[in-house]
Amino acid sequence: MIASLRGTVISIGLGTAVIECQGVGYEVTTTPTTLARLQRGEEATLLTTMVVREDAMKLYGFIDDQSREMFALLQTVTGLGPRLALACESVLTPLEIAQAIAGGDAKTLQRVPGVGKRMADRLIVELKDKVAAYTVGVVDDGAPTAPTQGVAPVVVVDQVTQALTGLGFTEKQADDAVAAVLSADPGLDTSAALRAALAKLGGK
């Protein structure tokens, strides 16, 4: 089992990155927020989980233990697979997911593309007892790590727009959301801008 990777980022796609470790390139599927923190040619470390299916093996990458643990917990819900679990973490932080479940907040969970009322209710019913302690454990660590400083606005626009279209939003939806978010606060870094744009789109 591959539990972590440390190596050079050699390519970044819409939903994946390739990290080269000792001459071997590993394709890692991860969230737009995590991808936005990676830079081609630079070293990166990701915690990983391998998901094995009959027709494929996939590596999923995470910035911290809380994200990886939440990814695993979400998949214990009936009918919720790795793709939707990752979508949840693309829109909400582990703490936000846990708080929404613990508080019975189906509306917040439905901000995730692919999570309808039925799935949101199922998340709450099946995980409410399991996240009670988790919400306490991630108060300090569940927030994103320190944002990258000094990112040029044009880079932020490109990265966030690409991340949103990768999540299934149309180019126009992505452009409009990014423009609105950065007009309100031009100083946002990529991670903050992405979360603000997702919140805006999720409220529609």
Curated annotation (Swiss-Prot):
Major location (coarse): cytoplasm
Superkingdom of source: Bacteria
Pfam family, one: RuvA_C
Entry keyword annotation includes Cytoplasm: yes
Stretch list, region Domain I: 1-63
Region Flexible linker, residue ranges: 143-151
Annotated stretches, region: Domain III: 152-204
Entry keyword set: Cytoplasm, DNA damage, DNA recombination, DNA repair, DNA-binding
Family as reported in the entry's similarity comment: Belongs to the RuvA family.
Complex formation: Homotetramer. Forms an RuvA(8)-RuvB(12)-Holliday junction (HJ) complex. HJ DNA is sandwiched between 2 RuvA tetramers; dsDNA enters through RuvA and exits via RuvB. An RuvB hexamer assembles on each DNA strand where it exits the tetramer. Each RuvB hexamer is contacted by two RuvA subunits (via domain III) on 2 adjacent RuvB subunits; this complex drives branch migration. In the full resolvosome a probable DNA-RuvA(4)-RuvB(12)-RuvC(2) complex forms which resolves the HJ.
HAMAP family noted in UniProt: DNA_HJ_migration_RuvA
Name of the protein this chain belongs to: Holliday junction branch migration complex subunit RuvA
Organism of provenance: Corynebacterium efficiens (strain DSM 44549 / YS-314 / AJ 12310 / JCM 11189 / NBRC 100395)
